[in-house]
Amino acid sequence: MREYAIEFIGAMFLVLAIALTGNPLAIGIMLMAMVYMGGHISGAHYNPAVTLAVWMRGKLKSNKLFGYMISQVLGAFAAALIAYVLIGKAFAPSPGIGVAAWQSILVEILFTFALCSVILAVATSKKLEGNYIYGLAIGFTLAVGAFAGGSISGGAYNPAVAIGPMIFKSFLGAQNWNNLIIYLIGPFAGGILAALAFRYLNEK
């Protein structure tokens, strides 16, 4: 249960940073801090796409896979609720105006691939065991992804960032679910590709 609690807390603060600031650097720093906070307990995924990649890597037991993902979505939902209480606005990611769905999906695939690849390398590779750079590397990867792709796809790179807030917005009667497919296909495809690439390029 400690692992699930950490995943809930980390996802909550990550999404809260997204909802309240929208600032890529602040979001990256928050992720970095949460990685250092919970890495030794849960692995600090805070992202179902990362959880899937780590599971494919063999570093997460199958009986914890969905528990992690549910905890992350619940944390994101809680963040959306808190943000609404604080600023009176319901948050959910969305693509830029005039951006085609395939463009958004491609951006989500690319930068989720980058994020998951970095996580698998710095947090699961034997050659980098015991390093203290992992949080910094992970946080800055997300920040760069948010700077680069935020105006295209919304820069989620994390299904929970979309699912939790979209569920909350649906309670307000304000949610359009059309964009959800972008934040499912893109991040999960990116995570799967990262795990496959890591398996091919690195030691088991």
Question: What spans do the regions from the language model cover?
Answer:
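Membrane-interface helix-loop junctions and terminal tails of multi-pass membrane proteins
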Residues: 1-204
